[in-house]
Amino acid sequence: MRQTFMANESNIERKWYVIDAEGQTLGRLSSEVAAILRGKNKVTYTPHVDTGDYVIIINASKIEFTGNKEQDKMYHRHSNHPGGLKSISAGELKRTNPERLLETSIKGMLPSTRLGEKQGKKLFVYGGAEHPHAAQQPENYELRG
């Protein structure tokens, strides 16, 4: 009788991928990147083990929105002080800090556990076309849609 394969840290091979965000829709890109970070694109996926790969996203400042989300979608944060609610539109966040826009979207699709935090640390987002990870020899990743 065969045993079900369970991955562990010793038999996981991690790859580095570069994804160009230019002209991509925010949600569609984020869901695909979240699946790569979790390792769901591999046959060795194991739910309780971090089997995912490293992802580098370039050109985050050229991400696109559908509809009127650039003006209508709002991001909120609160300082836990009275009157400490700060809101910013998606378009303004894209202009000021496009890296945070993508990181927030992708990390929201990962589990809210210690494993999810570990998976989120394998994400690197850059607003421009350059990245400092050439030594890792990343492969270009073609998105499905």
UniProtKB/Swiss-Prot annotation:
Keywords: Ribonucleoprotein, Ribosomal protein. InterPro entries: Ribosomal_uL13 (IPR005822), Ribosomal_uL13_bac-type (IPR005823), Ribosomal_uL13_CS (IPR023563), Ribosomal_uL13_sf (IPR036899). Gene3D superfamilies: Ribosomal protein L13 (3.90.1180.10). GO terms for molecular function: mRNA binding; structural constituent of ribosome. The keyword Ribonucleoprotein applies. Residues 72-91 are annotated as: Disordered. Belongs to the universal ribosomal protein uL13 family. NCBIfam families: rplM_bact (TIGR01066). This is Large ribosomal subunit protein uL13. It comes from Staphylococcus epidermidis (strain ATCC 12228 / FDA PCI 1200).
